[in-house]
Design a protein with these regions (language model features):
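Short alpha-helical segment that forms part of, or immediately flanks, the ligand-binding pocket
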Residues: 8, 27, 31-35, 46-50
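Aromatic "clamp/platform" in nucleotide-sugar-dependent glycosyltransferases that forms part
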Residues: 20-22
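A short, well-ordered alpha-helix in the C-terminal region of glycosyltransferases
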Residues: 81-94, 103-106
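Short alpha-helical donor nucleotide-sugar binding micro-motif in glycosyltransferases
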Residues: 9-14, 104
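Conserved active-site histidine-acidic residue motif and adjacent donor-binding/catalytic loop
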Residues: 1-10, 62
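C-terminal alpha-helical cap of glycosyltransferases
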Residues: 97-134
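Conserved acidic donor-binding segment of nucleotide-sugar-dependent glycosyltransferases
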Residues: 57-64, 73-78
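Short hydrophobic beta-strand element within catalytic cores of glycosyltransferases
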Residues: 39-42
Length: 134
């Protein structure tokens, strides 16, 4: 089990992060790889492509020929540093812990109804409500 700086070092040194899963929720490892600036190739399932439609590439799940073509394509294309920096910023802006926590709270408040709405109006130390600018 690797965390912290050693994990960042691994992601920053990978030429291409490949996630071939066909049944998975939003992958923490995918978010980690993207947040470090790694190029990512994922199976074309909504849980992956919700994150990689802009920064990343996908292949058809369980289609080894499509995976092979995607691997060849991604390994031969350049990935400009400017794009990598945009990717890092996008992930930090949209998927940081505090942002995701605010989004989960919004869903819970929406499901439960009015009693919890007052809680969303209180300023939470260190957090900006989803969609708001810091």
């Amino acid at each position: 089990y690797v965390v912290g700086d050693p994990l960042k070092e691994l992601y920053s040194n990978c030429g291409l992060f490949v996630l071939p899963s066909h049944t998975e929720g939003l992958s923490l490892s995918l978010l980690e790889a993207l947040s470090i600036g790694a190029r990512c190739l994922v199976s074309d399932i909504p849980e992956n492509t919700v994150v990689t439609d802009i920064y990343g590439a996908a292949f058809k799940p369980e289609d080894t020929d499509d995976l092979a073509r995607a691997l060849e394509r991604e390994c031969t294309q350049e990935y400009p540093d400017a794009m990598r920096q945009q990717q890092i910023q996008y992930i930090h802006t949209n998927f940081e812990y505090d942002v995701m926590l605010d989004r989960y709270e919004e869903v819970y408040h929406h499901v439960v109804g009015d009693p919890l709405k007052a809680m969303t109006k209180k300023k939470k130390k260190g957090r900006v409500p989803a969609g708001a600018k810091a």
